[in-house]
Amino acid sequence: MQQAVIANAAQAIHWADLGLNPIALDLGFLQIHWYSLAYISGILLGWYYLTRLIAQPGAPMARRHADDLVFYATLGILIGGRLAYVFFYQPDILLHPLDVLKLWQGGMSFHGGALGVAAGIFYMARRNGLSWLRIHDYVACCAPFGLFFGRIANFVNGELWGRPTDVSWAMIFPGAPDGLPRHPSQLYEAGLEGIVLGLVLSFFFWRTDARNQPGKLVGIFLLGYGLSRFVVEYFREPDAQLGTLSWGLTMGQTLTVPMLIGGLYLIATASKRTPINAD
């Protein structure tokens, strides 16, 4: 396999030849990165789609709640995503506590961001006397927007590349060790976690009665994301500071296992919860 990868290096696509630049706009005194725009785009499109979802009969919240939720979700993404990255992926940052605040240096965890959003939903729901589980159902349908743009931004940044491979679409990333052709795993994740999962959730929301079964849509999201992430991790290069863990899984796969279990549970038990009358 290693010899085949090396032999394929001459035909591999070079990321540097694509003309990509992590900086979207450079004003001299201010640089706007594609990664920042990805977060903003994901949040705004997610909010817009959420307003369409809650316009349907039987929605668990009003428009004003959706507007408030954007604030809590954004805080949850930033705080949860950063803290989880520090604790699970880069604990050495804790030796310099102020570095935890340096979000512009990169380092966010989806699993932590998801927990942060869940905490924000729970707080907002309790504060307004709403069903936190049903709000999760609706928000889950919007999450693929952020996942898609986030992974595309990873690709534009030339980071989180895949494992060495000899496939015809292999790419050479400038920061990858050994200069070997690798899977563009960022695009795999964008396709599975963003496009495919988004279409699946859209089908279940608009074409079935799933939105009236509390917990079913968020269960589908957890299961769909979990399966996508678990599989793509076999094509994605493990984090250099962690590698493959002693039990044979990467950290990403390990953190995904609870999502798979939770998703299966929510789907299996959705029919046992009180159905919502959408009339």
From Swiss-Prot:
Transmembrane region(s): 27-47, 69-89, 103-123, 138-158, 186-206, 215-235, 247-267
Listed pathway(s): Protein modification; lipoprotein biosynthesis (diacylglyceryl transfer)
Entry EC number(s): 2.5.1.145
KW Membrane (keyword) present: yes
GO molecular function: phosphatidylglycerol-prolipoprotein diacylglyceryl transferase activity
A single cellular component GO annotation: plasma membrane
GO biological process, one term: lipoprotein biosynthetic process
Annotated keywords: Cell inner membrane, Cell membrane, Membrane, Transferase, Transmembrane, Transmembrane helix
Cell compartments where the protein resides: Cell inner membrane
Record's bilayer topology term: Multi-pass membrane protein
Record-listed a 1,2-diacyl-sn-glycero-3-phospho-(1'-sn-glycerol) binding positions: 151
Family to which this protein belongs: Belongs to the Lgt family.
HAMAP family reported for this sequence: Lgt
General function of this protein: Catalyzes the transfer of the diacylglyceryl group from phosphatidylglycerol to the sulfhydryl group of the N-terminal cysteine of a prolipoprotein, the first step in the formation of mature lipoproteins.
Official protein name in the record: Phosphatidylglycerol--prolipoprotein diacylglyceryl transferase
Species this chain originates from: Rhizorhabdus wittichii (strain DSM 6014 / CCUG 31198 / JCM 15750 / NBRC 105917 / EY 4224 / RW1) (Sphingomonas wittichii)
Protein's gene: lgt
